[in-house]
């Protein structure tokens, strides 16, 4: 079998950033998959499931309520390696074009202090696995990366 695209990225050189992972064409529509990399793979500790789960709930809620992007959001969810998240948007976009959206989303996560949306037994299959304070921490850490993002944090390393 061929190696999938995400396994061809040099994870030794990869830094936290916002990257275009792939672009898929479905009929006339393009779907852009973004790699929201919060930790340096194989170097920094990965995120625990509780904060990953909390970030997932907060980001999905924010993105699906953001007036300019809500109709373009296909999916937001965690990477299995727990070093980041994937954001899928309907449309052909660059990292630079979605940088304001992703930055605003993670500022929301950084500053959020209320009950986590969907964190109830009726709404979620694992509602107790949440950690808002660590989600706030990771939100702040990633905002720092995004606010200072240059091309090395917006394009995969060669």
Where are these regions (language model features)?
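Arginine residue identity/basic-tract feature
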Residues: 22, 37, 64, 70, ...
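Active-site-adjacent, His/Asp/Glu-enriched structural segments that form or flank metal-binding
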Residues: 76-148
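Histidine-acidic residue clusters that define the catalytic metal-binding segment
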Residues: 144-158
